[in-house]
Each structure stands twice: as structure tokens, then as C-alpha cells.
Amino acid sequence: MKASYLETLDRIKDEHAEMSKHVNQQRSDIEKVALEKENMNRSYMTYAEVSNTLRSDLRKAEEINKRLQEFIMQSLAPQLSQDNQANCLAALEAFKTASPRENGNGAPALPPGFPPGAAGMLGMMPNMPFGMSPAMSQLFNQFASPHVNGGDGAGGSSGGASEAKKAKLEDPDDGELEIDVTNDDHPSTASNGGAANKNGRDSTNSVASSGASTPSIASNSRARQQQQPLAGLQGLEQMNFLAGFNPNLLRQASAAGGFNFLNDPHAQARLAAAIGQIGSRPAYSFKIVDGGVPTPTSFPPDAQKGPGIPTGLKKKMELNHGEVVCAATISRDNSRVYTGGKGCVKIWDVKESDISGATVVNRPPIASLDCLKENYIRSCKLFEDGNTLLIGGEASTVALWDLTTETKTLDLETDSQACYALAMSPDEKLLFACLADGNILIYDIHNKVKVGTLPGHQDGASCLDLSKDGTKLWSGGLDNSVRCWDLAQRKEVAKHDFASQVFSLGCCPNDEWVAVGMENNYVEVLSTTGKEKYQLTQHESCVLSLKFAHSGKFFISTGKDNALNAWRTPYGASLFQLKENSSVLSCDISFDDSLIVTGSGEKKATLYAVEY
């Protein structure tokens, strides 16, 4: 009897567990259906707005046509002779039945001057949903999405980024920046830009993404402009558009379709990428002069070759740090690599045989420096003699370490929750620290005192770099701005505003260009002397680190799309792209431009030899 009773209880428990499982599954399905319904409602509202705009424009055109006919018939025709009146009336009747071919258009309902291959272009004709190719349908969806028009729809993906590694941009109650690092999941396959996330994760550009493997930066900024990624327009490679069509058609499209092309440079870049091709691949570099419309960049013949221009990388060492590597640097003589993770900096020995050998070397570190009390390290700066290391991260202090004795010699107080980036003056006397509260602190390293503050960023200061002569400091922030500071006067002398948070920044050694990596997947190269800039679109997720070669001829950028891209300075011709297995969080280039090190969410750093 007792055994039967226990068996009955076990069966009831099993049935209850099974029912709970089904209930949870149904609840999950209901949430997914609700999300899909919400997305469908947003899409419906977008299409309804487009339809209403087109109907309104059609009514306007009909009214204008009616008034013109009345004016001709009532005011002009009576002044003509009888023969001319008859000819005028006949011409008016002929105009009513004129075919598109007679009007000089290559396709029905296209405006004059539009390329024949552009039939069905967004917002240019009332009957555009009919007869559109799949590629054009996708292009329409890109421009009609709520993201493009400043909405907060959830239909956009990261344009091919690993969905398990989206940046987590949270908004904590305390108003401070929050850094969170979790382990990487297995990378997922790339998804099309503009498609809904199939695994339930939010876009990299959303305010509350989850599952990040990268140290994420949470901000108290509520007004985040969300940008639709440029990458992922599948099928556009097959479209035979003319690259040099009349730019005034952008204004016609903006007026006819209700889309804000002229005030959204990213929408302009997407349109330019769709219709302008360079060689056999879609355009990925765009030149913008004085805030104008982005145009595909024309590269010189030697853009991807020549002395000092790399052709690729060869893996030489794998440095298994054991934690997510948020900072990495190479010593001046290439004999050491320093990697920063959670609570420690590890030092790795690099031998000439490691670089010249044919096999990938994997060995333990020669030393480990315990620092920042189990907080993640975000920046390491090595003195030129290789004996002193500055360490900053998710702590209120910046640590100074003597590497000869492997002891900490100084803690510099920042009065902030975190320090995201460090830079030193050329004479190594001054230290500059980017802080979570938006300030940039200046320390006298030798006298061990704070000597100044550069206030200006309205949100966390995330990155900085010095000009080669040390007179100018460039900083980027989560307030969507890049600022230039005159260090002699210690005041802001220039400011550049963007549509996205700035995550990384680097100054070209010739002091003519500054490259900026952003949360919206773009790299922008700004001229320090003129009004032109280049916009580069190869990344499929946010750009986390950026570094110029010491020659100034090229620079590299890394991101949450697991990619390392090498670009020609300044116009961004792609030299090569390398994919790792996880988000690439940090990078450095050796002083002689022969080595590159990357730190990743795979809890390791990788040392590469640069091939020329």
C-alpha cells in the first residue's frame, strides 16, 4: 500500500513537471507571438504612413494638373489663333495618353533621369509594390523600417553580427556606467540586415541587449538614436545600377516617399551602397565633404599595395589568459606581450623563434600581476623602457606597477567608478585618463598629483589618443561626440557630433586624420585640417578597438562581429579581414609594425605576424 502511494506521488510529480514544462513552453510561444504581432503592427504602421504619403502626393499632383489645365484653357488658349487653339487642345489630349517611353523613361512611372534598372525604387511611384525584385523589396524594407525613420522598432538585427555577443547597453538606476562581462556563447550564423532576431536577442543597437561577452558600457543617456546596420543587404550585388546617377534624385525620393534621406547620412550611405558598386563588390567606403551626401570612394591604383602596406596576418602565438582579455599591449622591443583580464595582468615572453617558426606557439605566462581587486582591466600603458606599467579599469584608481620587482608603486585616485582608457604624453610625464563620469583627468606621474581636468563629455568618456607632437588630445564618448583639446590651454577646441556612441579612437601619426569606431558598426575617418571624412562599413557589429600603425599608412579595427579589419589611411581601402571565434575586444600594433596582438571574449589573446 505504501509503495503504491509513493508511486502515485512520483507519477503526480512527473506529470506536474511535464505540465509545467508545457506551460512554460506555451508562455514562451505566447511571448514570441506577441513580439511578432508588435513587429507586424509597426510594419503595418510604417506601410500605412508610406501609403498615405503617396496618396497625398498623388492628390497634390492631380490638383496641380487640374489647375494647369484650367489655366491653359481659360487664360492661354483664348489668346491663340483658331489653328493654334486646335493644336493646343490636341496636344493636351495627347499628353493625357502619353506612354512612359514617349516621356523618355525606361520603365513605367519613373521620374526623368532615373536609371532604367531602378524600377521600383522606394517612394518614387504609386505602384511601386508591384513587380519589385527581391533585392528591391529588401531595400524597401531597409528604408521603410522604424529604425531608419528614428522609431524604436525591433525589426533590425546587427547585420550579421554573432547574435550571442550583442553589446549590453543598460540603464542602471544609479546613473553610473555599468560594465558587465560574461562568457561567450557559440557564435551564431550571420543574419540579414533588417531581419528580426530569431534567437530572441536584441540588436546591438538596442538599449537592453543581453548575452554580451564584451565589457559593455551602460549609460544614463535615455535618448539613444538607433541606427540600422548597413551590412546585410543580400542580393544587391546582382543589381545593375549606375553608380553616377543624378544626386537630385535623393531629394525627389525624400519628397515623394516621406523618408528623411537628406538629414540621415546613414540612410544616404545605405542608398549609395545599394546603387553604387566599386569593381565587383558593393561599396564599403564613402566620402563625405562638408556634411554632404555620401558618395562611394574612388581608390587610387596603389590603394592595396606598395611599401609598408600589409597583405595579411599569420598567427604565431595563442596566449590563454583564462579570462576575457579587455586590454593588450606589446613592448617596444617585441619581447613581451601584456594582457589584461579580470583582476590581473599577465606577462608573456615572445622569442624570435616564436615569430619565425611555422607552428603556433602556446605557452604559459612568465608572470601575473594581481591588481584592481577582481575588476576588469580596460587599458594598459607601458613606459618606453619597459619597466613601468599603468593599469586602468573598472575601479576608482589607476595603478602604477614596477615590472622589475613586480610590485605596485602607486594608486592614483580618480573619484569615478571606472577608467576606460589611458594615454601618456610623449615625455611620459603626464597621464590622461578617460573616466565613466565623462571627465578626462590629467596626472603628473613623477610628482604623483592630479594637475587638471578636462570636462565636456556629457556621458562616459570611452577612448582617447594624443597627437604625435603631444599638443592635442582627442577623446570620444558615450554622448555621441568626439572632442579635440588644446593641452597648452587645456580647453576644447573642436567637437564632432555623431549619430551613435563612440567606442574607440586613434590618431594617425601624421596628425592629419583621426579614426573613430562606433556602436552603430561604422568607422569614420575625420580630417583634422579639412571638412572631409570617410565612412567605412565593413564591420557587422559595434567597433570596440582601433589602432594606427606607427608608419601611419594603415590602421586596424576590431569588433563584436569577431572581425579584425585592416584599412588603408585615410580612405579606407580594405587591405584584409581576419575572423576570430569570438568578439575581438582589444588590439595593439608593435612599434615596428611587424606584430599585432588581439584580445578576445574567448579568454585568450592572439599574436600575429604582419605579412607584407
From Swiss-Prot:
<feature type="repeat" description="WD 3">
    <location>
        <begin position="414"/>
        <end position="444"/>
    </location>
</feature>
<feature type="compositionally biased region" description="Gly residues">
    <location>
        <begin position="150"/>
        <end position="159"/>
    </location>
</feature>
<feature type="repeat" description="WD 5">
    <location>
        <begin position="538"/>
        <end position="568"/>
    </location>
</feature>
<dbReference type="GO" id="GO:0000122">
    <property type="term" value="P:negative regulation of transcription by RNA polymerase II"/>
</dbReference>
<dbReference type="InterPro" id="IPR036322">
    <property type="entry name" value="WD40_repeat_dom_sf"/>
</dbReference>
<dbReference type="GO" id="GO:0061629">
    <property type="term" value="F:RNA polymerase II-specific DNA-binding transcription factor binding"/>
</dbReference>
<dbReference type="InterPro" id="IPR005617">
    <property type="entry name" value="Groucho/TLE_N"/>
</dbReference>
<dbReference type="GO" id="GO:0003714">
    <property type="term" value="F:transcription corepressor activity"/>
</dbReference>
<comment type="subunit">
    <text>Interacts with unc-4. Interacts with ref-1. May interact with mls-1.</text>
</comment>
<keyword id="KW-0805">Transcription regulation</keyword>
<dbReference type="GO" id="GO:0050770">
    <property type="term" value="P:regulation of axonogenesis"/>
</dbReference>
<keyword id="KW-0217">Developmental protein</keyword>
<dbReference type="GO" id="GO:0090090">
    <property type="term" value="P:negative regulation of canonical Wnt signaling pathway"/>
</dbReference>
<keyword id="KW-0804">Transcription</keyword>
<dbReference type="InterPro" id="IPR015943">
    <property type="entry name" value="WD40/YVTN_repeat-like_dom_sf"/>
</dbReference>
<dbReference type="GO" id="GO:0007268">
    <property type="term" value="P:chemical synaptic transmission"/>
</dbReference>
<dbReference type="GO" id="GO:0050807">
    <property type="term" value="P:regulation of synapse organization"/>
</dbReference>
<feature type="compositionally biased region" description="Polar residues">
    <location>
        <begin position="202"/>
        <end position="221"/>
    </location>
</feature>
<dbReference type="Pfam" id="PF00400">
    <property type="entry name" value="WD40"/>
</dbReference>
<dbReference type="InterPro" id="IPR001680">
    <property type="entry name" value="WD40_rpt"/>
</dbReference>
<dbReference type="Pfam" id="PF03920">
    <property type="entry name" value="TLE_N"/>
</dbReference>
<feature type="repeat" description="WD 1">
    <location>
        <begin position="308"/>
        <end position="339"/>
    </location>
</feature>
<feature type="compositionally biased region" description="Acidic residues">
    <location>
        <begin position="171"/>
        <end position="182"/>
    </location>
</feature>
<keyword id="KW-0853">WD repeat</keyword>
<feature type="repeat" description="WD 2">
    <location>
        <begin position="372"/>
        <end position="402"/>
    </location>
</feature>
<dbReference type="InterPro" id="IPR009146">
    <property type="entry name" value="Groucho_enhance"/>
</dbReference>
<dbReference type="GO" id="GO:0005634">
    <property type="term" value="C:nucleus"/>
</dbReference>
<feature type="repeat" description="WD 6">
    <location>
        <begin position="579"/>
        <end position="609"/>
    </location>
</feature>
<feature type="region of interest" description="CCN domain">
    <location>
        <begin position="153"/>
        <end position="196"/>
    </location>
</feature>
<dbReference type="GO" id="GO:0005667">
    <property type="term" value="C:transcription regulator complex"/>
</dbReference>
<feature type="region of interest" description="Disordered">
    <location>
        <begin position="143"/>
        <end position="228"/>
    </location>
</feature>
<comment type="similarity">
    <text>Belongs to the WD repeat Groucho/TLE family.</text>
</comment>
<comment type="function">
    <text>Transcriptional corepressor that functions with the neural specificity gene unc-4 to govern motor neuron identity. In concert with unc-4, represses the expression of VB-specific genes such as ceh-12, thereby preventing the adoption of VB motor neuron fate. May function with transcription factor mls-1 to promote uterine muscle specification and formation.</text>
</comment>
<dbReference type="GO" id="GO:0045202">
    <property type="term" value="C:synapse"/>
</dbReference>
<keyword id="KW-0539">Nucleus</keyword>
<feature type="repeat" description="WD 4">
    <location>
        <begin position="456"/>
        <end position="486"/>
    </location>
</feature>
<keyword id="KW-0677">Repeat</keyword>
<protein>
    <recommendedName>
        <fullName>Transcription factor unc-37</fullName>
    </recommendedName>
</protein>
<dbReference type="GO" id="GO:0050803">
    <property type="term" value="P:regulation of synapse structure or activity"/>
</dbReference>
<dbReference type="GO" id="GO:0045892">
    <property type="term" value="P:negative regulation of DNA-templated transcription"/>
</dbReference>
